[in-house]
Design a protein with these regions (language model features):
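N-terminal secretory signal peptides and thylakoid transit peptides that target proteins
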Residues: 1-17
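Active-/binding-site microenvironments in catalytic and ligand-binding cores
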Residues: 2, 24-355
Length: 355
């Protein structure tokens, strides 16, 4: 694959992929190669689609009309969190600073993922014995290393660079010790407010959770659409449940760096066709092993780098699954307010479904 340049894409009219090219073959292969992924990174690219200076990527698909339509989905006023509790050290552990902050963190791990480290620390100063009759404040300091497999977090497009570039052709040199100079989380500083749709794949297959390395294919997504009675529309936030947390409760942690259920690479093409704005899951999106030799996480690679599509990793979708099944409604209002941290390549988040 030759390096993709902004000049090349913009000269082609700002859209790297014609509708005819997307539809070629009308199939979603299950035997992609690294060469296929490199080709799709060009063909499916959104670089230049929203202008040469765009940093929002597929968030552009969440229009004012989309937000109004999403608000109309609220009938019961019931809110459901899709986030895990912060992965704090257990009582009695040594705690300690996070990576890059002066030392190694305490060992732990929530539901597994290779790194058995604590991703959060909280230091609090409790009231002293002489403060009973005083008005006193209790303060704490929270630090978090959120990327990885233990914390519900958002990946901004700048979380991944490939061949010296990030989404929309910005150079790798835009990074510094102050973070990402382009494509950071600030493109979502006004919050996310759109229709969310849940793909409950274990319910589709009649199992409590998927196998440890079970792949989800486009055919599964379309079968769930038919069963649940909705269709992904432009601007939708797509959440995919694998049943990870049920599996963790029953069998113990998964090492997500070695083996995890998740989406097969060809699902990116389908998501691009449908106009999804955000992709999230209770795992880290990609099935592992990826089944694409030489490409460890093709979903991450194509979604972040080529589509400019933010990702929500490690969501807890169990309460959402129950709430949706109870109502037989798998579409809902999704709200999410990322922290406004200039240069951040993402951040811990608490996505909320409102029915």
């Amino acid at each position: 694959m030759e390096p993709i340049t902004r000049r090349t894409l913009l000269a082609a009219g700002g859209v790297a992929l014609s509708g005819e090219a997307i539809a070629a073959g009308g199939k979603y292969p299950r035997d992609l190669t690294k060469e296929d992924v490199d080709r799709w990174m060009k063909e499916l690219s959104n670089w230049g689609k929203w202008g040469p200076n765009d940093q929002a990527g597929t968030i552009n698909l969440i229009t004012n009309a989309k937000r109004k339509a999403a608000a109309a989905l609220v009938r019961d006023g019931v809110c459901v969190s899709m986030a895990l509790d912060a992965d704090l050290p257990k009582e009695g552990s040594t705690g300690g600073p996070l990576p890059g902050m002066g030392g190694a963190p305490a060992a732990r791990g929530q539901g597994g993922g290779g790194a058995s480290r604590t991703t959060w620390t909280l230091t609090s100063r409790p009231p002293g014995p002489d403060s009973r009759d005083l008005a006193a404040y209790v303060v704490d300091t929270i630090a978090v290393s959120y990327h990885g497999n233990n914390t519900t977090h958002l990946d901004a497009p700048s979380h991944l660079y490939y061949k010296g570039q990030i989404y929309n052709g910005y150079p790798q040199s835009s990074y510094s010790d102050r973070g990402a100079g382009k494509d950071d989380v600030m493109s979502m500083k006004n919050g996310i407010f759109t229709r969310g749709v849940l793909f409950d794949i274990p319910k589709l297959k009649g199992v409590p959770y998927l196998g440890d390395d079970e792949a989800i294919y486009v055919e599964d997504l379309e079968a769930w659409e038919k069963k649940a009675g909705f269709r992904v529309e432009p601007g939708d936030a797509v959440l995919v449940r694998t049943g990870r947390w049920v599996r963790v409760r029953e069998k113990g942690p998964l090492d997500l760096n070695r083996s995890t259920p998740g989406l097969y690479a060809s699902c990116v093409k389908w998501l691009r066709e449908r106009g999804a704005s955000i992709l999230g899951s209770d795992v880290v999106q990609d099935v592992r092993p990826s089944r694409v030799e030489g490409v460890n996480q093709p979903i991450h690679q194509m979604a972040l780098h080529s589509l400019g599509m933010p990702l929500i990793d490690n969501a807890d979708l169990e309460a959402l699954s129950e709430a949706a099944a109870q109502r037989r409604r798998w579409a809902y209002l999704l709200t999410m307010n990322p922290l406004r941290v200039p240069g951040a390549t993402g951040g811990p988040v608490n996505p909320i479904a409102v029915f």
